[in-house]
Amino acid sequence: MKPVIALVGRPNVGKSTLFNRLTRSRDALVADIPGLTRDRHYGEGRVGDRPFIAIDTGGFEPVAKEGIVAEMAKQTRQAVVEADVVIFIVDGRLGLAPQDRVIADYLRKTGRRILLAVNKAEGMRYTAVASDFYELGLGDPAAISAAHGDGVNDLVAEALDLAFAERPELAEAADAHDHGTRIAIVGRPNVGKSTLVNALIGEERVIAFDMPGTTRDAIYVDFERNGKPYTLIDTAGLRKRGKVFEAIEKFSVVKTLQSIADANVVVLILDAQQDISDQDAHIAGFIVESGRALVIGVNKWDGLTGHARDRIKHDMERKLQFLSFANVHYISAKERTGIGALMKSVDAAYAAAMVKLPTPKLTRVLMEAVEYQQPRRAGVSRPKLRYAHQGGSNPPIVVIHGNALSNIPETYRRFLEGRFREAFQLKGTPLRIEFRTNKNPYAQSND
C-alpha cells in the first residue's frame, strides 16, 4: 500500500504546482486564479524507490459555511482524513496570513503528521523565509520552490519517512495497485457526471454542485463493485467556448479527450431534459474514433412524461444512429436508479472490447456471409474474400485477406460488421474491419 500525502493550504499558494512536480504531470490545472482546484485530485509519484500517492486539494478556508468555498473545505477535510502525512503549504513572498493561522489550528487538532512548507522561497535567505512561520507551532519550516524544484525532494523524503514510521505496514506492499477496468465518465457540463460517480462509490468524492463547470479536471477514483476492481475517470464537462476562462477551457477539453483515450470503457452521459446537441454528437464521434467501448446513460429520466421520453429516444435515433453498437440505459444518478444495469453493460462492453476471436470461426463466419451475399463487382473483377483473422483488440480488429479488395463498398463492410457482431455477440464496442489484398505471386516485377 502506498503512503498518501495531502497538500493543503489557502488558495494560490502553489499546491497544484507542487502536485504536478511530484507526479511529473500536468494533471492539476495551474493558473493564477484562486479556487481553481475544487476537488481532491489524486496522482502517483516516486522518490527513489519509494512510490506514494499525492492529493491536491482546493484552497482551504475552514470557516466557510456555504457555497462552493464550503464544499472545497469539505473536500480538503476528507483529504486530510485519507492522508498519512499532510504538507501544509504557505506563501513565503506574502508572509504569514491570518488564514494560515486558522488552517494550522485545524490541522493540529486532526492528529495527522504535519510538515510545513514555505513555497516561493527561491532567492530568499532561509532565516527571512522561516522566521514568520515559526509561530504556527508546526516545527521547522521547509523552504521550497514548487516551480523550480528547490527543496522538493528533501521535503517529500521527510514526509515518506514520517509515513513509514507511523505505519510500518505500508512497506509490505508499496507497489501493489490494481486499477481494474478504467471507466471514463464524459458529457456536457451539468448532465450529472459527478453525481453518478458519487452514486457508484458511495461517498461525496467529487463535488456535485448545482453549477455548470464544477468539475474542471479529470479525477481518478479506484473502487470495487461486487468484488470487481474499477477506476472511474470523472472528466471536466465539455462546453462551448466563451462560458469559462479561455485558457482553462482549452486545457479541460484536451483533458477530457485524453481521459477517453486512457479508458477501457466510456460512459457517455446525456441529459434527458435537453435535446441531443451537436456537441453530444462530437463527443460521441471522438469516442468511436478512439475505438473505445461505450455505454450510454440518459440521466434525469425520472419524472419525465411519456411524450418527453419518446422525444429524447427519437432524437437519439436521429442524431446518434452511429452508436447503435452501444447499450443505452435510462437512469437517475440522483435517485440511484438504473445504475446496476448500466454497470453490467460496462462489464459486457469491456469483455467485448478485449475478446479473442479464433481464426477458424472468423473465416467460417466470413464464408457464410459471402455465400449469403457476395460483394458487388468493382471494375473488371469481383472481390474475392478468402479468410479472416484478428488483428488487435480494444477495439477488436478483423483483418480480411483476399483479392481485388481495394474497392469494397462501405455498405458491404457494414454488412460484414453486422455478421461478425451477431456471431461473436460484440455489444458495446466498436469493431474495425481491414481489407488486405494478397500479392499475386505470378505478377511480373519491374526490377
Swiss-Prot record:
SUPFAM superfamilies: P-loop containing nucleoside triphosphate hydrolases. Keywords: GTP-binding, Nucleotide-binding, Repeat, Ribosome biogenesis. GO terms for biological process: ribosome biogenesis. Pfam families: KH_dom-like, MMR_HSR1. It comes from the Bacteria. Residues 355-439 form the KH-like domain. One of its GO terms (molecular function) is ATP hydrolysis activity. Residues 3-167, 181-354 form the EngA-type G domain. PROSITE patterns: G_ENGA. GTP 1 binds at residues 9-16, 56-60, 119-122. GTP 2 binds at residues 187-194, 234-238, 299-302. Associates with the 50S ribosomal subunit. HAMAP family: GTPase_Der (MF_00195). NCBIfam families: GTPase_EngA, small_GTP. Belongs to the TRAFAC class TrmE-Era-EngA-EngB-Septin-like GTPase superfamily. EngA (Der) GTPase family. GTPase that plays an essential role in the late steps of ribosome biogenesis. This is GTPase Der. It comes from Ralstonia pickettii (strain 12J). The lineage of its organism: Bacteria, Pseudomonadati, Pseudomonadota, Betaproteobacteria, Burkholderiales.
